[in-house]
Regions:
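Short, ordered coil/turn segments that flank beta-strands lining enzyme active or ligand-binding pockets
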Residues: 1-3, 12, 100
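Generic structural signal for well-ordered beta-strand positions
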Residues: 7-8, 105
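Short active-site neighborhood of thiol/selenol oxidoreductases, capturing the structured segment around
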Residues: 8-30
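A generic structural signal for alpha->beta connector loops
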Residues: 15, 45-46, 72
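Hydrophobic beta-strand anchors of alpha/beta hydrolase catalytic cores
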Residues: 18-19, 48, 95
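Conserved Rossmann-like nucleotide-cofactor binding loop
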Residues: 24, 56, 103
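Structural microenvironment flanking redox-active thiols in thiol-disulfide oxidoreductases
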Residues: 30-68, 79-86
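Thiol/disulfide oxidoreductase modules built on the thioredoxin-like
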Residues: 66-72, 78-123
């Protein structure tokens, strides 16, 4: 999390989770963030983890969020790349969707509009 405390995702079962891996230098990451925030605000049944893949820096990340109009997404880091290794990630942005039982059910490598009708229709199948 923002304080570099480990977050146990196994304790989050029961909710759909989106693990969104991003970096401030990644243009597609910047473009998709507003729709990710909108999804997080309007879909309480989905827990969103926006994970900054850069060197952990709370102030810089807050400034980045502010520069693109993000006001309510929590900040997470993966400084030891544990999640990157666990999910065998390649490239940014990457979004991993996890069902209520803790199993990955989809992965998007590249930019996505999280609030599009197509995405909404898809993810509702897993509520």
């Amino acid at each position: 999390d923002i304080n570099l405390q480990e977050v146990d995702l196994t304790n989050k079962k029961g909710n759909i989770m989106i693990l969104n891996f991003w970096a401030s230098w990644c243009i597609p990451c910047k473009r998709e963030m507003p729709s990710l925030e909108k999804l997080a605000k309007n879909s309480p049944e989905i827990k969103v983890y926006a994970i900054n893949m850069e060197k952990p820096n709370k102030l810089r990340t807050r400034d980045f969020y502010k520069s693109i109009g993000i006001t309510s997404l929590d900040i997470y880091f993966d400084p030891e790349f544990k999640l990157v290794k666990q999910f065998k990630m390649r490239g940014l942005p990457t979004s991993i969707l996890i069902d209520k039982n803790g199993k990955e059910f989809a992965r998007v490598v590249g930019e996505i509009d999280f609030y599009s009708e197509d995405f909404q229709d898809f993810i509702k199948k897993y509520y």
